[in-house]
């Protein structure tokens, strides 16, 4: 199958827009519809030559067509020897005034009048020259695409014409003898003798390393060119080209007789027969080529910028130093530095977004044409936790979803499709718990109408306010469902007033928002709500093109046993079929199965319908866009580009830091950290829990999620926790198996599993509070004034009178002199006359001895107090 090249790849290679390439192609007669269209390698080569040179390729003349046509091997064909002679004669005439004449004369040294086999040897040498030239051209075309645009000096057209004539003549000669057998031993021996004579006359040369390759001992098809190793560039200046052509062609190498090198390993087949030539010109790398335009990403280091400009790093750093910028090669360049460097080096710099390389959503965007059909509306039910969102959906679907939810709260996004009056409606049920704000955000991204459920007896709550904010930002129509109207304490006017304060004015108050009283428990108002949904959808005129390539949004993803990575998607445009190749962020695959909300396998899903997709290579992130591709190769390329971008971004951020970042990193190092390994059943829960855990922190403690993933708890997770200090293993809606439990017991690892998210967060909060340093408050118990001092064998005794409260033995004490604290310590001895007492009340005299302190003088005030530990909180 002929290899294809996309138009936007040609545009990127040449540094121009895809629109210009399409225009040039139309001038050449090549029909191209868009930047994603493909052309053959021959058309791409001709198009690139036309854009670079500005001249259309000339059509071959009748004489050239006759000369380049390969003769068919029939009994009436002319003798191959005569045909070869004609080719060589024509070649000599054409190149009589150029350095190529030397090559042809060398090829004529073998007598071809009487030996048909010698002709084959001669043409084989010519073929060898041709292969070297063609491999050089191919190597030039295979320069790695890295955003660097190289401008080469344009060569005279006369030399290019001579080179093309030379190659076509050699191809003609090769074709004329392609059906003949191998060269005889006599000719082989003669060539070997000539080589030895030449080596003897030219003196001792540097010994070649490795084993010589016998190219005559195998058929022509067994000798292949190693294009990956070939580095000779054909696009040289005039002087270099003449030197290259005038170089004497090397003669065929023969295998040396067995000797001291006989035990060396033989060279593998398929090695490059022109390796010597490659070594000779290996220094001709494109280091001195002029760079006039370069495309760079927004985040680029100094050494990366130098590589793009094909300049030494020292030159770039020297310019930066001259500007007073002390930067190293690993520092990132800002927009100002890039602008200055581009002016200094005379290079036009274009800042490109690396996301464009894998922006398949924009590349494959389908325009919804006038033939698009009506699609069902997508409704997202949102509101505060326990306000009855899932119960409302139960009443609509006549199912009991709430009974299956742990703790009676929704912890996943549910997607369902129902029919009302013959029209389909798709519902998304989002969680109302505070931890699931990202899930609610994804719900607004794919919805057409938002239903905000508010309990009539509870009013507006924090998550209700968040939903109102999301609805205003997304500019999606809103319908307010006032639930729990069957309760005696229901107050719909209170709900309307609170919502009006936040910008959602009811229609009966002169606003534009429908407020519908309902009761999910009794079913009151459900039909009226559905009628309003259909009426609003009719006004929106929702349409989609069912015949387009499928585009779907991932609302949930997980790793299921027996199915692997799965994703719940809602189709936004086109039709997704079983067998389609899809890409979704950094994951890709082929749709093996589609499962609807009733656990039934279906063959396809149309716009605004939902299903579970099976067949991806890894669990995609929730909120990603899934697109259908024409081939597995195309899907894989987009996914790998996205993976490389994510990896590069992560590595860049790990080293990109400012002074403020360094200060915060030092502060982070002083925090006490609780390491967590987290495993959940679905990606949405993983995202919500990980985000909530990262918010559980203060200036003293924090949580560090060192590993997280979707799926069951494995032995690797247990090993990771056992090898980490101060680490816990958490599982949400997953349970460890027998072998994992045994390993955890052996490693003394405690596995904590949960099914309700707020229980997990409460436990983690308690663990963090236990890691915090205790806080104490002081309670003053009394004061005494020193009236006299006495020396005792164990220390100084202060005779005191209690003037406030009471003194307590064993408590803490501080000595105050002239209003200044001079010592804090412990009261070790308290006596009333000669008796030891535990405490002395107000107005009584006593003897006091302070541990380790004898510098008490008359007039000091001794104050006793105790510290009470306070409960800490985040």
Curated annotation (Swiss-Prot):
GO MF assignments: GTP binding; GTPase activity; translation initiation factor activity
Similarity-based family: Belongs to the TRAFAC class translation factor GTPase superfamily. Classic translation factor GTPase family. IF-2 subfamily.
Function of the molecule: One of the essential components for the initiation of protein synthesis. Protects formylmethionyl-tRNA from spontaneous hydrolysis and promotes its binding to the 30S ribosomal subunits. Also involved in the hydrolysis of GTP during the formation of the 70S ribosomal complex.
Region (G5): 519-521
Spans annotated as G4: 483-486
Annotated binding of GTP, by residue: 383-390, 429-433, 483-486
GO cellular component terms given for this protein: cytosol
Region named G2: 408-412
Keyword check for Protein biosynthesis: yes
Keyword annotations of the record: Cytoplasm, GTP-binding, Initiation factor, Nucleotide-binding, Protein biosynthesis
Signal peptide region: none
Organism whose genome encodes this protein: Sulfurimonas denitrificans (strain ATCC 33889 / DSM 1251)
Region annotation G3: where it falls in the sequence: 429-432
Bias type Basic and acidic residues, positions: 103-139
Protein name: Translation initiation factor IF-2
Encoding gene, per UniProt annotation: infB
Biased composition (Polar residues): 56-71, 82-93
PANTHER family referenced in this protein's UniProt entry, alphabetically: TR-TYPE G DOMAIN-CONTAINING PROTEIN, TRANSLATION INITIATION FACTOR IF-2-RELATED
tr-type G domain location: 374-543
Alphabetized InterPro entries for the sequence: EF-G-like_DII, IF2_II, IF2_N, P-loop_NTPase, Small_GTP-bd, T_Tr_GTP-bd_dom, TF_IF2_bacterial-like, TIF_IF2
The UniProt record lists the keyword Transferase: no
Subcellular location: Cytoplasm
């Amino acid at each position: 199958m002929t290899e294809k090249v996309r138009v936007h790849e040609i545009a990127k290679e040449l540094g121009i827009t895809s629109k210009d390439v399409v225009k040039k192609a139309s001038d050449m007669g090549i029909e191209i519809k868009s930047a994603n269209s493909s052309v053959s390698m021959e058309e791409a080569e001709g198009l690139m030559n036309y854009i670079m040179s500005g001249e259309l390729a000339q059509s071959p003349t009748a004489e050239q067509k006759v000369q380049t046509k390969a003769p068919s091997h029939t009994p009436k064909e002319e003798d191959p020897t005569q045909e070869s002679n004609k080719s060589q004669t024509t070649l000599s005439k054409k190149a009589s005034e150029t350095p190529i004449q030397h090559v042809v004369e060398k090829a004529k040294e073998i007598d071809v009048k009487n030996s048909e086999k010698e002709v084959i040897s001669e043409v084989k040498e010519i073929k060898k020259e041709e292969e070297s030239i063609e491999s050089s051209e191919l190597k030039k075309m295979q320069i790695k695409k890295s955003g660097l645009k190289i401008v080469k000096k344009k060569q005279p057209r006369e030399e290019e014409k001579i080179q093309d004539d030379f190659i076509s003549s050699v191809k003609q000669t090769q074709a004329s003898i392609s059906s003949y057998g191998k060269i005889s031993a006599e000719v082989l021996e003669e060539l070997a003798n000539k080589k030895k004579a030449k080596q003897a006359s030219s003196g001792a040369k540097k010994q070649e390393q490795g084993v010589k390759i016998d190219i005559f001992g195998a058929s022509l098809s067994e000798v292949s060119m190693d294009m990956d190793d070939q580095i000779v560039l054909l696009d040289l200046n005039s002087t270099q080209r003449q030197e290259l052509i005038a170089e004497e062609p090397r003669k065929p190498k023969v295998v040396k007789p067995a000797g001291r090198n006989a035990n060396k390993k033989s060279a593998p087949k398929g090695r490059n027969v022109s390796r010597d030539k490659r070594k000779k010109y290996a220094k001709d790398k494109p280091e001195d080529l002029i760079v006039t335009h370069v495309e760079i990403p927004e985040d680029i280091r100094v050494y990366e910028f130098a590589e793009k400009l094909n300049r030494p790093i020292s030159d770039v750093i020297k310019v930066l130093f001259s500007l007073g910028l002390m930067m190293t090669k690993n520092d990132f360049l800002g927009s100002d530095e890039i602008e200055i460097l581009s002016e200094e080096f005379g290079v036009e710099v274009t800042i490109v977004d690396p996301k464009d390389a894998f922006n398949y959503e924009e590349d494959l965007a389908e325009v919804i044409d006038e033939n698009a059909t009506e699609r069902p509306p997508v409704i997202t039910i949102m509101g505060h936790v326990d306000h009855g969102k899932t119960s409302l959906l139960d009443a609509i679907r006549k199912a009991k979803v709430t009974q299956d939810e742990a703790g009676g709260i929704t912890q996943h996004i549910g997607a369902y499709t129902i029919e009302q009056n013959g029209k389909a409606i798709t519902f998304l049920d989002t969680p109302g718990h505070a931890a699931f704000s990202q899930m609610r955000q994804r719900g607004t991204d794919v919805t057409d109408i938002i239903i905000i459920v508010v309990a009539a007896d509870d009013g507006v709550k924090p998550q209700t306010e968040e939903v109102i904010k999301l609805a205003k930002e997304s500019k999606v129509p809103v319908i307010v469902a006032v639930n729990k109207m069957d309760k005696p304490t229901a107050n719909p006017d209170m709900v309307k007033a609170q919502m009006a304060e936040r910008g959602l004015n009811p229609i009966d108050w002169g606003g534009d928002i429908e407020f519908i009283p309902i009761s999910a428990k009794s079913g009151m108002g459900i039909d009226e709500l559905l009628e309003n949904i259909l009426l609003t959808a009719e006004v929106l005129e929702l349409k989609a093109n069912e015949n387009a390539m499928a585009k779907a949004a991932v609302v949930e993803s997980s790793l299921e046993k027996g199915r692997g990575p799965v994703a719940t998607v809602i189709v936004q445009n086109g039709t997704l079929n079983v067998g389609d190749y899809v890409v979704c962020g950094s994951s890709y695959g082929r749709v093996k199965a589609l499962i609807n909300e009733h656990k039934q396998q279906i063959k396809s899903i149309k716009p605004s319908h939902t299903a579970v997709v099976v067949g991806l290579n890894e669990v995609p992130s929730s909120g990603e866009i899934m697109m259908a591709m024409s081939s597995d190769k195309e899907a894989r390329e987009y996914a790998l580009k996205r993976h490389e971008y994510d990896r590069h971004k992560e590595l860049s951020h790990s080293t990109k830091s400012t002074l403020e970042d360094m200060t915060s990193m030092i502060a982070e190092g002083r925090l006490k950290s609780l390491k967590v390994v987290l495993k959940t059943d679905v990606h949405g829960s993983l995202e919500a829990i990980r985000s909530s855990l990262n918010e559980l922190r203060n200036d003293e403690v924090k949580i560090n999620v060192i590993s997280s993933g979707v799926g069951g708890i494995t032995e690797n997770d247990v090993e990771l926790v056992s090898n980490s200090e101060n680490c816990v293993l958490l599982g949400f809606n997953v349970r460890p198996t027998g072998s994992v439990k045994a390993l955890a017991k052996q490693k003394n690892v405690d596995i904590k599993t949960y099914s309700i998210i707020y229980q997990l967060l409460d436990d983690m909060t308690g663990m963090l509070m236990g890691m915090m340093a205790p806080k104490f408050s002081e309670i003053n118990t009394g004061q005494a004034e020193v009236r006299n001092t006495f020396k005792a064998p164990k220390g100084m005794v202060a005779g005191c009178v209690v003037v406030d409260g009471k003194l307590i033995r064993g408590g803490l004490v501080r000595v105050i002199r002239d209003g200044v604290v001079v010592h804090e310590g412990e009261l070790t001895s308290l006596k009333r006359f000669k008796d030891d007492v535990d405490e002395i009340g107000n107005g009584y005299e006593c003897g006091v001895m302070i541990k380790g302190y004898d510098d008490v003088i008359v007039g000091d005030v001794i104050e006793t107090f105790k510290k009470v530990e306070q409960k800490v909180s985040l």
